[in-house]
């Protein structure tokens, strides 16, 4: 959901500048002659590289998921790391006098696909949302027994075993749902899949003499800022020996602003994320933070005793926390519903035009206009076909296993709900993948939310919350992975990589991710206070998703006083903001805030929005000084900042589990208390 928002806004400037030069970045004749067989595109060194990159990025995105829930698109960064890893590998072996296979762009594509498939499970596996929403802590934060529809039986504590099994059951079904339609989507409909195309352009560019020189500069920038970020995170650790200690509690704008979450916390992860995200995303985050923590929450807090009982704690769902959660839900639902209808409408019109063109013979004339290189790509893409029976048998087998196993794991979700879900999955997956091909927007979270409300309402009060949350994960996983696979097929089509090797690498990455993601989650869950709304790892979307399920069970009776009217207003604002954005000229519309981005700081606070705006400011200043160099180096520098800070999580987690505490607590207080 959060990465979807950044995908639709973030047409990377590198993509804009080089997309038209795709033909120029490669010697087509040599490329077509030197394509290795599909089995040789998958190598042992490639799987090792994918595993290492997948683990690193799983740790990074898990931290982002459990702190704010906002995850930028890291595919370009993963492609760069894959290139760095394998180019270094081959050079070291060559210097040692060991003969090794040449590093091809097909192998680069396979490694990038496998690594992204691995860490995508950590992003979208529900560890910060629908699965974590089942635990006891989130149940208590949602009001416990004081909230109608929120029953203590509707909980399930996280466990490596059941989480791993659930991921295997749901993810592999989605992997096979749309395989038979790959030719229709990529060749017949010629869907662009902008993220897949951008990744292909980057990889093609790496494997040219000019691109190799550019890559060396990017590698140097990545290593430099990775080292700085890691050392800075290590340095900060020494001063964080308490709950409110360290640089993350630095009162940048004063102590009163600190209380309202307005401060710069020196997080290189979010500075790097801000460099990757478009300026409008970061501005929207800051606008949401000012509106909520700067204006609304202080005003509503002042109405204690009038709008809600003064005896209630602030974190009660019938107190201030209820307004925070449900108003952010209304923004998310308003934005999601608008985008959902818009994409369905756009998909329908586009398909109607395509069918009309085919019937009138226009598609043949378009085919005649294709270049020889395009026709050759199409031929290679079709040549290594994936047998229909493999997809059909695999889909049926995984579906049967899921229909049997998931109701055993979650008795609240009846088997017939799963049967209906798997019957609808291919059509839902096709709709989402087609829309993603046109707009680069993965609407899987919105399909999941629709399933959440329907199942929560149908399953009844006792079972509704669990059925809604698990059903949401089921639909979301199938629909999302189907769309991701089509993005990868587009990348493979443009880099002359076999669809078979792409499917196998996606399957390997998914299998690795289904094991790595739960282990990564438990690293955080055991080492840190995950779910504490006053701490760093708030996991805000776990609370959001559980309350959406309660809303599906109980309706509007779950809301605190006057909250419904505010929710109506913010829902309408989300729809209106999107309408204005789409209808006005780009010069004006592009500056309308994004409701989905605004919703995140409503729960989390304003500190990370300030971090990300610092990242935006760096990119803006860099572009003003040297636009070409900025376009080349920003992704590498941002990736270095994110990876260095993210990798420090591993040693810090080990230290926390071993009971080793930082030696110093650096805190701040008013000068009147200094005596």
From Swiss-Prot:
InterPro entries: OPT (IPR004813), YSL-like (IPR045035). Expressed in leaves, anthers and pollen grains. Restricted to the vasculature. The gene is YSL3. Pfam families: OPT (PF03169). GO terms for biological process: developmental process involved in reproduction; iron ion transport; response to nematode; seed development. Belongs to the YSL (TC 2.A.67.2) family. Keywords: Ion transport, Iron, Iron transport, Membrane, Transmembrane, Transmembrane helix, Transport. It comes from the Eukaryota. It comes from Arabidopsis thaliana (Mouse-ear cress). The lineage of its organism: Eukaryota, Viridiplantae, Streptophyta, Embryophyta, Tracheophyta. Disruption phenotype: No visible phenotype. This is Metal-nicotianamine transporter YSL3. GO terms for molecular function: oligopeptide transmembrane transporter activity. The chain crosses the membrane at residues 42-62, 66-86, 114-134, 159-179, 219-239, 280-300, 325-345, 386-406, 408-428, 450-470, 504-524, 556-576, 602-622, 630-650. PANTHER family: METAL-NICOTIANAMINE TRANSPORTER YSL3, OLIGOPEPTIDE TRANSPORTER YGL114W-RELATED.
